[in-house]
Regions:
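N-terminal beta-alpha lobe that positions the nucleotide/phosphoryl donor
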Residues: 1-192, 196-211
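Acyl/amide activation-and-transfer machinery of modular secondary-metabolite enzymes
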Residues: 152-159, 295-304
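Glycine-rich active-site loop/lid that clamps phosphate-bearing ligands
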Residues: 243-298
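A short, well-structured catalytic beta-strand-centered motif of the EAL phosphodiesterase domain
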Residues: 206, 210, 303-307, 319
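Short, well-ordered beta-strand elements within core beta-sheets of diverse protein domains
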Residues: 86-88, 119, 165, 301-310, ...
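Active-site "cap" helix and flanking loop/linker of ATP-utilizing ligase/carboxylase catalytic domains
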Residues: 159, 165-199, 207-261, 331
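A short N-terminal helical cap/helix-turn-helix that marks the beginning
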Residues: 232, 321-336
Length: 336
């Protein structure tokens, strides 16, 4: 929810003598500001996309930095998320419009018009690493997730493990993420997001909460991330070490949104008939039922279909069958 990454809320919870199930407020605040997150990430040894050292206040400053960084450039909101406040500039002429547009969009969406610059990678993979740490000096990674299939910079399909990286790359980036988590003194579950292009990883942000796509990590590791974050908040140690974690099979998540399948326009309304998929290796997380009214507010995500197979081909076969079985009527959805 909206409070999961709200540092002020976490602080209020702690001030009232309660335990916030999640990271410390300082880490939520650091990683919520994308500029501060890059500074923290650099100190923790994470590889970064070439870009501005901090927030850029004027177009004149942006033009000067662009000479060193090179085009194409991405102008990004410091407090952004969900693909909002991001504009691509392919030249100095386009930069002026992108800079102004990104700031306006950021101000309207997040109440903060701070932006920064990054080199725009034209064909990257979006790969994220699940990390988890306790208050006893233990931090591990639970492998990576491939999240490259997106629309409007928002994910549609996720899978684990990624078919795009090697075992050596997987081990290296996982260890880098775990070491950075320990270096930061981070507590609880978190996700480090990277862009991967030309065999290089570049850190872009850290989500200080449980991700929508966490079930595919649970499927291939057998670890209940919800349970573990509650146990960590209760002061317990992680019940496993890095060497104990085994990855089994392949998992894919399909986000089912109340959106028109071609235009992605929202489609709120009443669900007259709902039939979720079932069977071996199939999991459905949803609030839907026959008669449920999909509201016109918030996110359009209404269900998550997760499949687990012995390998990628097996998982894809299960996904095809599960999608055929899944019925939501009469609302148009991305199932179609």
């Amino acid at each position: 929810g909206f409070l999961a990454e709200n540092a002020d809320f976490a602080s209020i919870v702690q001030a009232h003598g309660l335990v916030f199930i999640g990271p410390e407020p300082e880490h939520i605040r650091q990683m919520g500001d994308k500029v501060q997150a890059k500074i923290t990430a650099a100190k923790a040894g994470l590889p970064l996309v070439p870009g501005s050292p901090g927030a850029v206040d004027t177009i004149e400053e942006a033009q000067k930095l662009a000479v060193d960084i090179g085009f194409p450039l991405l102008v990004k909101a410091a407090s952004g998320g969900g693909g909002r406040g991001m504009k691509v500039a392919n030249s100095a002429v386009e930069l002026s419009e992108a800079f102004s547009s990104a700031r306006s969009e950021a101000k309207a969406a997040f109440g903060d018009d701070k932006v920064y610059l990054e080199r725009y990678l034209d064909n990257p993979r979006h790969i994220e690493v699940q990390v988890i740490a306790d208050s006893h000096g233990n931090a591990v990674h639970l492998g990576e997730r491939e999240c490259s299939v997106q629309r409007r910079h928002q994910k549609l399909f996720e899978e684990a493990p990624s078919p795009a990286i090697t075992q050596t790359q997987r081990k290296n980036i996982g260890q880098i993420a775990a070491n950075a988590t320990l270096e930061m003194g981070y507590l609880g579950v978190g996700t480090m997001e990277f862009l991967f292009q030309d065999d290089e990883f570049f850190f872009i942000e850290m989500n200080t909460r449980l991700q929508v796509e966490h079930p595919i990590t649970e499927a291939i590791t057998g670890i209940d991330l919800v349970r573990e974050q509650i146990c960590i908040a209760a002061g317990q140690s992680l019940p496993f070490k890095q060497e104990n974690i085994q990855f089994e099979g392949h998992a894919i998540e399909c986000r089912i949104n109340a959106e028109h399948p071609e235009t992605f326009a929202p489609t709120p309304g009443i669900v007259n008939f709902f039939h979720p998929s079932g069977g071996a290796g199939i999991r459905v997380d949803t609030v839907l039922y026959s008669g449920y009214r999909i509201p016109p507010y918030y996110d359009s995500l209404i269900a998550k279909l997760i499949v687990h197979g012995r390998d990628r081909q097996h998982a894809l076969a299960r996904l095809r069958l599960a999608l055929q079985e899944f019925v939501i009527e009469p609302i148009p959805t991305t199932l179609e």
